[in-house]
Amino acid sequence: MGIIDEAKRGQITDEMRAISKLEGIPVEKVRNRISEGKIMLIRNAKYPSRKLVPIGKGLTTKVNVNIGTSSEVVDLDMELQKVKVANKWGDTLMDLSTGGDLDAIRRDIIKASDLPVGTVPVYQIFIESFKKKSGGAYFTEDELLNTVEKHLKDGVAFMTIHAGITKDLAIRALKSDRIIPIVSRGGDMIAGWMIHNNSENPYRKNWDYVLEMFKEYDAVISLGDALRPGATGDAHDEFQIGELLETARLVKNALQKGVQVMVEGPGHVPLNEIAWDVKLMKKLTGGVPYYVLGPLPIDVGAPYDHIASAIGAAISSASGVDLLCYLTPAEHLGLPTVKQVEEGAIAYRVAAHAGDVVKLGRKARKWDDEVSYYRGKLDWENMISKLIDPQRAYQVYTQFGTPKVKACTMCGGYCPMMWAMDQVRKIGSSSSL
């Protein structure tokens, strides 16, 4: 029995109690929202990760870190270093490898990760088909489904399943005047398969069986947005919305079967459209968790897309997004280094908390208030220890040596907090004030 079925039966399990304690909300709310599909636990029940990662309504915004080899760069040691970065800064991890021994790489990443690991199974079968049959779209439906099952057996906790795109939507998008017809790698693979085989989406055709597989492991289906906008000029066109409508139907069906499900979102979206993108998705899907790639509010930001997208991510988080998929400085340019993975993850930790201050209010802001209290007291040790990155903060604080006065090296002896404390002492010692 999966966690949704347990919640629907009114059961309160140890996992629900753990979520309640972690997030600081009543366990009855946790149970009720799980039963409605508004909270879920990212896990593979047969191979639990070392970190508990719930996402959804009323919970803190979580951050996903993408790693993985490419056809151009296969360096497993580097990817395992990225896993260490993800363990420190992230909540979930996706292996998007497309080069090397994909089975071995995936298993090594799962073994090294403290976090729930996700994959995009169509990558593997497309690449294997390309190598063995001289064409990526030559795989069979059974081969795709067997790949999904293999990933579940390996302990994968969530998978991007591009089931929302139909053959009609794919053909019309490719013939359209979109700036970039299809930007999703997995979505393009499914579109290519449908066109080559003159057949409907293999995930949709076998949807009941897909649900059965995920139900067995109580793992999470992450419904991919194959037609997400790859340019801000394509945002919220008929193809993105058309796929979302199809996805919403699949969501309802999955929840009816007791299968955990979330929806993936864009992508490239102008700043003024981000909040209502979230509201639209939540409305159409009944409030299931939303997993969003930023979004990027501009298209010209590379190699600073981690900064540009963090702006969009803060707005999307504040508007109700539950899981943020990070971007790195290498986005749109190449495979990221370990350092670039860290830069992206930290940017998204900042964005997630900025959103939570709006979304969760006082519960999230307590952290900021504590830091500000110590800052006002010039209590550097306690203030620095509470920051997002204490180690880096201390390096910056001491980069010109230890300050000669209690203040930092920016204001020195003219620090307003230092002067304010001095004035308070004078006021307290004066009988005339």
From Swiss-Prot:
Keywords, sorted A to Z: 4Fe-4S, Iron, Iron-sulfur, Lyase, Metal-binding, S-adenosyl-L-methionine, Thiamine biosynthesis, Zinc
The answer to keyword Metal-binding applying to this record is yes
Q: Name one Pfam family in it.
A: ThiC_Rad_SAM
Does Transmembrane helix count among this protein's keywords? no
Q: What does the note under cofactor report?
A: Binds 1 [4Fe-4S] cluster per subunit. The cluster is coordinated with 3 cysteines and an exchangeable S-adenosyl-L-methionine.
Please cite one Gene Ontology biological process associated with this protein.
thiamine biosynthetic process
State where Zn(2+) binds.
H268, H332
Molecular function in Gene Ontology = 4 iron, 4 sulfur cluster binding; carbon-carbon lyase activity; zinc ion binding
- From which domain of life does this come? Archaea
**Broad enzyme group:** lyase
According to its UniProt record, which reaction does this protein catalyse?
5-amino-1-(5-phospho-beta-D-ribosyl)imidazole + S-adenosyl-L-methionine = 4-amino-2-methyl-5-(phosphooxymethyl)pyrimidine + CO + 5'-deoxyadenosine + formate + L-methionine + 3 H(+)
Q: Where does substrate bind?
A: N66, M94, Y123, H162, S184, R185, G186, D225, A226, L227, R228, E264, Y291
E.C. no = 4.1.99.17
So what family is this one in?
A: Belongs to the ThiC family.
Q: What does this protein do?
A: Catalyzes the synthesis of the hydroxymethylpyrimidine phosphate (HMP-P) moiety of thiamine from aminoimidazole ribotide (AIR) in a radical S-adenosyl-L-methionine (SAM)-dependent reaction.
- Which protein is depicted? Phosphomethylpyrimidine synthase
